[in-house]
Amino acid sequence: TATAEGRVVPGVRHCLLRIEDPTWPAGWSTAAATHHRNAVRPDPDTAFRIASVTKMITATTVLALTDQGRCRLDDPAAAHLPADVVDRLPLDGRAGPGTVTIRQLLDHTSGLPDFFSHPAIWAAIRHGGGRRRFTPHDLLDLAADAAPSFPPGTGRAYTDTGFVLAGLLVEHLTRAPLHEAYRTLVLDPAGMDATWLESSADVPRRRRMLAHDLDGRDITDMDPTVDWAGGGLVSTAADLARFLRALTGGRLLSREAWRAMTRWRPGPAGYYDDYGLGLGRYRTAAGPLVGHHGVWGAFAFWAPGLDAIITGTVSRARVDRRPLLEAIAATLLSA
């Protein structure tokens, strides 16, 4: 607890943290006063937006489909997407220098422009009262406003666009809404009954979430459609720990799919030391930390050398959580 309290970023209204390891399975949380009408004081079961931590779950869903033989990672993505989606972006080589594969959607090597950097997205986030809603197709149209960053497979740049396409691919292959595919392929097998896609009909009744701050502005009321398969899930620290236990314990994917997911390459600039498929890795003095963080404050990491899991969130968006994660891992190593 002392380590976590000493590493929380100044200005954070609350931090929710869960730590599990073989010798110390524990959940810890702390709360500060908050005045947003929809906010709640955190406890270990409080839900929060996990933002890009969603990418781990989207990638796992796609990999589960590869295990079922419905697609292969090196298939052209366009082969498993509706024509109206393919026509929106340079996926099949007709409008660009190369063909984007499913693998490249998940490892940020597609070269596709990132819709999440579009001014319209951030206007919607900062002025949530406007209630602008985005369909996945709207998000792709925003991405199409910019040129590709590089030919597919020749570079690496973080882009949520690949994961929105992955979500559409999942829907096309399963003939089901994304939230149902998540539930069938990942959430139910992992025992995650407190996780849902916020923009879907899967939202539990009477569930409230932690408030989120962005540059001093309360953005709790922003519309949840701004990211979808790249960052639209809501979860709890306990559910994220269940996901990591199921994923790393071999209950969600075959060994072959797990090896593909953890085939590490240098990470996108400014994000991770290494990146696989929807999965990042930090190299630390206490050993590697494998997982993902999200822009609104969420984090979910596994320390394989310690068999420890660290999950949770802080209320402030776009803050660096790596020092907190490294401090916790170092404390567990020395315990």
Named regions from a protein language model:
Residues 1-50, 70-71:
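Short, conserved catalytic-motif segment at the N-terminal edge
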Residues 16, 278-280, 299-301:
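Short, surface-exposed charged micro-motifs
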Residues 20-23, 49-72, 76, 80, ...:
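Alpha-helical scaffold elements that line and support the substrate/ligand-binding pocket
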Residues 27-30, 300-317:
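Short, well-ordered beta-strand elements
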Residues 38, 70, 75-76, 93-95:
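Active-site-adjacent loops and short helices of periplasmic peptidoglycan-processing enzymes
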Residues 88-292:
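Short, surface-exposed loop or secondary-structure junction motifs
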Residues 318-335:
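Short, gly/Ser/Thr-rich active-site loops of penicillin-recognizing serine hydrolases
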